[in-house]
Amino acid sequence: MRILMNKFVGAVQLIIDIGNTSISFALYRLDKMQIYCKLGTKRDLSFKELYKFLKVKFDYKVDQVFVSSVVPVIDTVLINAIVSLYKVNPLFIRFDLSYDLSFNLYNNNRFVLGSDVFANLVGAIEYYNINDALVVDLGTACTIFAISRREGILGGLINGGPFTDLNALIQNAYLLNDFNLAVPKKLLGLSTIDSVNSGVIYQYKYLIEGVYHELRHNYDKEFRLIITGGNSYLVLPLISVDFIANLYLTLEGIRILGNAFKGDY
C-alpha cells in the first residue's frame, strides 16, 4: 500500500487547528511533532496578541503552515500574523479541495464537512493505515463519524460536548450551580451534583459504545474506534470496548492533507 510522504523532505511545518474553545499548534520536522501548545480561542483575538504568541512559542524558520478553522472570524488575523512572521501563505484545509490520498473519500456521497471532522477522518485511515474507522471527537461538540477505505465517508452524528451540555443545563436549572466535570466514581450519584456529573459523562459512554456496536452489526465491518478531543479524558476511563486514543489526531490529519494537497497556495 502506498505510504504518504511529505513532499518537502526536511520541511518545518506549523500545523494549526482553530477550534471553538481552543487553538492547537504543533511544529513538525521530518514528519515528527516537535512542539505542541494551545491558546484559548477568542473571537476578538488581535494581530499583536497572536504574533507575540507565535514569536515566543515558534520562533523558527517555518516552511509551510497548514490550518483547519471552524472560527472564520479569526482567519484573517491568523493569515496576517503567519505572513508577517514566517513569510509564507498558510493553506486552509477544506473538504472541497483536491488531495492525493491513498483512498477515495467520496465513493458514495459527497459530504459537506467541517475541516476538523474532515481531518479526523483522513487521519484515522491514513495515519493508522486501517480500512474502517469510527472516529469520535469530544470537544465543544461531540462528533461521531464513520469512514471506510473502500466506501469513503459513511456519515455521522453530532451532539453537544460535555461542557456544552452542562452549561445548557445550568442555564436552565435555577437551583443548579456551576461545577467542574470529572470522571464519575460510579454510575449512580448520591447528590444532585454527582448525579448531574454522572449523567453528563455516562451519556457519552453509552452513545459511543451504542453507535460502535450498531455500526459493526449493520455494516458487517471491523470498525476501529478512535477517540480524540480535549474533553475525551472524561470518558476514556469508562469505555469498555477496544479503542485508540489520540489527542493529536486532528493535527495529524491536517498535516497529512496539507502534504497531499494537489495545487498551489
Swiss-Prot record:
Cofactor note: A monovalent cation. Ammonium or potassium.
Catalytic reaction(s) noted: (R)-pantothenate + ATP = (R)-4'-phosphopantothenate + ADP + H(+)
Required cofactor names: NH4(+); K(+)
Class of the enzyme per the UniProt entry, highest EC level: transferase
Record-listed E.C. numbers: 2.7.1.33
Pathway of action: Cofactor biosynthesis; coenzyme A biosynthesis; CoA from (R)-pantothenate: step 1/5
InterPro entries: ATPase_NBD (IPR043129), Type_III_PanK (IPR004619)
Keyword Kinase: yes
CDD domains recorded: ASKHA_NBD_PanK-III
Active-site positions on this chain: D116
Keyword Nuclease attributed: no
A cellular component annotation (GO) from this entry: cytoplasm
Residue numbers binding substrate: G114, S115, D116, V117, T192
Localization annotation: Cytoplasm
Amino-acid positions noted as binding ATP in the UniProt annotation, renumbered to this chain: D17, I18, G19, N20, T21, S22, I23, S24, T140
Swiss-Prot/TrEMBL GO biological process terms: coenzyme A biosynthetic process
Keywords associated with the record: ATP-binding, Coenzyme A biosynthesis, Cytoplasm, Kinase, Metal-binding, Nucleotide-binding, Potassium, Transferase
GO MF entry, a single one: pantothenate kinase activity
Binding-site list for K(+): D137
PANTHER family: TYPE III PANTOTHENATE KINASE (PTHR34265:SF1)
Sequence similarity: Belongs to the type III pantothenate kinase family.
Subunit structure: Homodimer.
Function: Catalyzes the phosphorylation of pantothenate (Pan), the first step in CoA biosynthesis.
HAMAP family: Pantothen_kinase_3
Name assigned to this protein: Type III pantothenate kinase
Name of the gene: coaX
